[in-house]
Every structure is written in structure tokens, then in C-alpha cells.
Swiss-Prot record:
UniProt cross-references to HAMAP family, sorted A to Z: MinC
Gene responsible for this protein: minC
Record-annotated disulphide pairs: none
Designated name of the protein: Probable septum site-determining protein MinC
Annotated GO biological process: cell morphogenesis; division septum assembly; regulation of cell division; regulation of cell septum assembly
Top-level taxonomy: Bacteria, Pseudomonadati, Pseudomonadota, Gammaproteobacteria, Alteromonadales
Listed Gene3D superfamilies: 2.160.20.70, 3.30.70.260
Source organism of the structure: Shewanella denitrificans (strain OS217 / ATCC BAA-1090 / DSM 15013)
Reported function: Cell division inhibitor that blocks the formation of polar Z ring septums. Rapidly oscillates between the poles of the cell to destabilize FtsZ filaments that have formed before they mature into polar Z rings. Prevents FtsZ polymerization.
Matching InterPro entries: CAP/MinC_C, MinC, MinC_C_sf, MinC_N, Septum_form_inhib_MinC_C
UniProt keyword Cell cycle present: yes
Keywords per UniProt: Cell cycle, Cell division, Septation
Length: 221
């Protein structure tokens, strides 16, 4: 008997959702370019689902929007929460139509290992803790990037970028002795520097997911 050439299995992936809140493509392009300039490595090449709930009653050229995003190296896999007219456009463009629903309950994750870094992480450096939590005894400087599939604990200042829960774990957290980050992300939900400025702290703080947003908690020293 010959071996199977393929096998179809059900699985799940963590995808970022881009919420379109304006049908003006010129305004969209300008705002998107600004965000991309702040964190290009976080966005470029990332698969996205487009949420069209806010523009479902407007005349949106989905083909032009797709071109706008692809020109910026963003990969569009489908749309969600769209009007029948936009769904028809999406199918003509070969995009998936994804139904919005409650998040499925995930199985408990196995206990992770911990990757420990006993030095400062400097500009241009990237550290990735695959299938592990990341503990840094030092600061994460401007232009540095730290990524973990689990949580990130920084015993110093966070001034660069920190991305926890990279494998999709919503329960991951980011803890730092002071929070002055360029970007923080937990399982695809992110804040850029402009949002973080109102939360910048010289005290020990924890960032965690709060539904479809993030929240900051001050911790005891």
C-alpha cells in the first residue's frame, strides 16, 4: 500500500486582527505607515484578519485595501464581521470569510522551561525564548527586542520591545522594574510607545491581557 500524500487535520493559530474603522484609504495608509515605522519587525510578514464591522455600511473598495496592505508586506488571510456586499468582494478576491465567535477553551499548557539572561540586552540584539519563559537580569535597551512563548520577567528597565505569549498563550505576562517600552505585545495584542506613554512607570509593573486589550498593574518593589 502506498503512503498517503497528504493528511487533513484541524488545528488553530493565533492571528492578529486589523480593525478597519475608516473607509478613507488615504487616511488608512497614512496611519498604517506611521504604525509600521514604529514597529516594522512586528507587523511585516504577519498574517492578518481584517475586521470590517465598523465600515460595513460604507462603500469600501476591498480590492484596493488588499493592495494597500500587501504593498506594505502584510499578509491578508481573510475578513470577519463584514456586510454581505463586502463578503461578496472578499470571496471574489480569494479571501476567507471567518466567523467571529467565542474563544475556544484551550488545553492546559505543559510546564515551561525558563531561559535566563544575566546581562543587559543592547540595541540591535534579539533574544527569543522558544517554548520557555524569559528572565533577564538587566535592562532591555532602546532598539533591543525580547520574545518569549511564555512570560517575560525583566529585572531592570524595559526600553525596547517585549513580546510575550508568542505561541498564543493569553495568560503570559510581561514584568519589568520600570516601563518605558517602544512596544509590548502579549499573544498578538500590542501597545506601541504612544499608548504606553500614559502608563510609563518608574516602579515595578506587570502587563497582562484584558480581553482584547492590555492592562498595566503596579507591583510591590
Amino acid at each position: 500500500m502506498s503512503k498517503q500524500s497528504l493528511e487533513l487535520k484541524a488545528t488553530s493559530f493565533t492571528l492578529s486582527v486589523l480593525h478597519i474603522k475608516n473607509h478613507d484609504l488615504i487616511a488608512l495608509a497614512a496611519e498604517l505607515d506611521q504604525k509600521l515605522s514604529q514597529a516594522p519587525q512586528f507587523f511585516i510578514g504577519a498574517p492578518l484578519v481584517i475586521n470590517l464591522k465598523a465600515v460595513e455600511k460604507h462603500c469600501l473598495d476591498l480590492s484596493a485595501l488588499k493592495t494597500l496592505l500587501m504593498d506594505r508586506q502584510l499578509i491578508i488571510v481573510g475578513i470577519t464581521e463584514a456586510s454581505p456586499e463586502l463578503i461578496e468582494q472578499a470571496r471574489a478576491l480569494g479571501l476567507a470569510v471567518i466567523k467571529s465567535g467565542k474563544q475556544a477553551t484551550t488545553a492546559p499548557l505543559p510546564q515551561r522551561e525558563t531561559k535566563v539572561v544575566k546581562q543587559n540586552v543592547r540595541s540591535g540584539q534579539q533574544i527569543y525564548a522558544k517554548n520557555a519563559d524569559l528572565v533577564i537580569f538587566g535592562a532591555v535597551g532602546n532598539g533591543a527586542e525580547v520574545i518569549a512563548d511564555g512570560s517575560i520577567h525583566i529585572y531592570g528597565a524595559l526600553r525596547g520591545k517585549a513580546m510575550a505569549g508568542a505561541a498564543g498563550d493569553h495568560n503570559s505576562v510581561i514584568i519589568a522594574n520600570s516601563l518605558e517600552a517602544e512596544l509590548v505585545s502579549i499573544s498578538g495584542q500590542y501597545w506601541l510607545a504612544e499608548h504606553l506613554q500614559q502608563h510609563s512607570l518608574d516602579k515595578r509593573a506587570c502587563i497582562r491581557r484584558d480581553g482584547e486589550s492590555l492592562m498595566v498593574e503596579t507591583l510591590p518593589q
